[in-house]
Each structure stands twice: as structure tokens, then as C-alpha cells.
């Protein structure tokens, strides 16, 4: 099933998406490269009454051999990119590698992500488990209303 340039595949093994390489299959996997792709995947799941899980690098993920009865979303492409915007800011997609973000920040002279150098996860995963918080500008925490992250 193709939705807005992103692909939703059904009956996808999840073991290859985890660091320990075990687990069953998901009913569906959406590899999303854009915010619109995520929106479309969520709509697709809601239309089917399916639960949703977002998966990053799979470094903190154990999947049951029974699999996941729902839609798994992976953030790829632009949603896993990293861009240094100025001397004080860097944009990271939720699917961006946390160690890679640390490297890019250090190369740009930015500080604050050093703790993540050895964490094999994603920026989105670090936000989810509250290891980091987004900031809008130097010294201010970022609070983004729905749809503002476009």
C-alpha cells in the first residue's frame, strides 16, 4: 500500500529492526520520510482500528515472538536527518541517530548532547524517554503545538 510517497507494507518481520534480532512480525510497517507520511500512516491505522508503535534503531526494544498486532512507524529520510541551522541551533529528525547527532553537534561547536555519544538510539527515542528536551532558542524550552513541526 503506497501512501503519499511513503510505503506501508503488511506482515513485516520485526526481528531485523531490533538490536537483538528476535521477535515476530507486525501487521504493518510504515517507513515514513515526511510529516505527511506519518500523518497518512496514522490515518491508515485509525481507519483500521490498529494500535501504533514508533520504532527507532531498535536498541531498547524487545518484540514478542507473537509480533505486534498493529502498525509500526519508522522515521526515515528527512525525518532521520540532521541539519546545523546556526551557531546555536541544530535540527534533528526523530529518526536521527543520537551518536551521529552528537558528532554533528561537536563538529559545529554545539554542546549539550555529549551524554548520547554511546547510546545507540535515535533523537526521538531520547526525547521519548526524557533524556533530552527540544529547545526553540538558546535558553528557552520548546513547546510545539500540534502541526507546528512542519
Question: Each PLM stretch: what is its role?
Answer:
Residues 111-118, 122-150:
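FAD-binding subdomain of flavoenzyme oxidoreductases
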Residues 1-123:
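Anion-binding (especially nucleotide phosphate/pyrophosphate-binding) glycine-rich loop
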Amino acid at each position: 500500500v503506497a501512501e503519499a510517497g511513503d510505503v506501508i507494507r503488511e506482515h513485516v518481520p520485526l526481528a531485523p529492526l531490533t538490536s537483538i534480532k528476535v521477535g515476530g512480525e507486525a501487521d504493518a510497517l510504515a517507513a515514513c520520510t515526511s510529516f505527511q507520511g506519518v500523518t497518512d500512516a496514522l490515518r491508515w491505522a485509525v481507519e483500521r482500528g490498529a494500535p501504533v508503535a514508533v520504532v527507532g534503531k531498535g536498541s531498547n526494544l524487545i518484540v514478542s515472538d507473537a509480533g505486534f498486532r498493529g502498525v509500526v512507524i519508522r522515521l526515515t529520510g528527512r525525518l532521520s536527518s540532521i541539519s546545523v541551522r546556526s551557531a546555536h541551533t541544530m535540527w534533528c529528525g526523530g529518526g536521527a541517530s543520537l551518536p551521529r547527532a552528537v558528532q554533528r553537534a561537536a563538529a559545529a561547536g554545539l554542546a549539550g548532547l555529549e551524554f548520547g555519544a554511546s547510546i545507540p538510539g535515535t533523537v526521538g527515542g531520547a526525547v521519548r524517554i526524557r533524556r533530552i528536551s527540544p529547545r526553540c532558542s538558546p535558553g528557552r524550552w520548546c513547546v510545539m503545538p500540534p502541526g507546528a513541526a512542519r
